[in-house]
Amino acid sequence: MSTAIVVFSGGQDSTTCLIQALTQYDHVHCITFDYGQRHNQEIEVAKKVAIELGAASHKVMDVGLLNELAVSSLTRDNIPVSHELQENGLPNSFVPGRNILFLTLAGIYAYQLGAEAVLTGVCETDFSGYPDCRDEFVKSINQSLVLGMDRQLEIKTPLMWLNKAETWALADKYGKLDYVRNHTLTCYNGVIGDGCGDCPSCDLRKNGLDAYLENKESVMADLESKL
């Protein structure tokens, strides 16, 4: 029996990963991290979506210490989410160490459950400039977890080389485009579905959806060539 863990936020990307994983593994468990994020409504959304889609279990883990250590517009209500890059070349929504912590804890959880894979929705194509979403980083932490726990584990990134239009196409391939569009929370300002329409996350989501809906056959063909 195959088992996987999905690092799950209830957003477009992780929900699409969950939808795909449910067709590929016998048991799929979700893990969501509560770090006092600005859009903390995502935790309730994640709970609802995990149940509705049929995850075997859903664990919410308190990692509030990350909020104390990592200053970001996603961890501080008094820091507005900006469309501009900071002096260090990163968006102010970058939470230092977030995916290092999340993937490490997900790896430990996989060890506990005997899961062979951890899935995460990070990608390098339409990403927001976060260094911990790069393929190089994921491969590095995967190797460290295998060495540190002396157990085989694969961190899978189904969306790594997909653009946002292709991510929408992937949801549509499994008949879940409308579900992902209407029930997930990607917006930094906590607006479910199509979002606030103003934050960087909503821009990426909308632009990708528009690109897919305008040229579905071509985008789906591009997706199929990458699967």
Curated annotation (Swiss-Prot):
Example GO molecular function: ATP binding
Binding site for ATP: F8, S9, G10, G11, Q12, D13, S14, T15, T16, C17, L18
Cofactor note: Binds 1 zinc ion per subunit.
Gene Ontology biological process: queuosine biosynthetic process
EC number: 6.3.4.20
UniProt keywords, alphabetically: ATP-binding, Ligase, Metal-binding, Nucleotide-binding, Queuosine biosynthesis, Zinc
Pathway of action: Purine metabolism; 7-cyano-7-deazaguanine biosynthesis
One Pfam family this sequence matches: QueC
Binding sites annotated in the UniProt record for Zn(2+): C187, C196, C199, C202
Alphabetized Gene3D superfamilies for the sequence: HUPs
Cofactors: Zn(2+)
Similarity-based family: Belongs to the QueC family.
Biological function: Catalyzes the ATP-dependent conversion of 7-carboxy-7-deazaguanine (CDG) to 7-cyano-7-deazaguanine (preQ(0)).
Protein name: 7-cyano-7-deazaguanine synthase
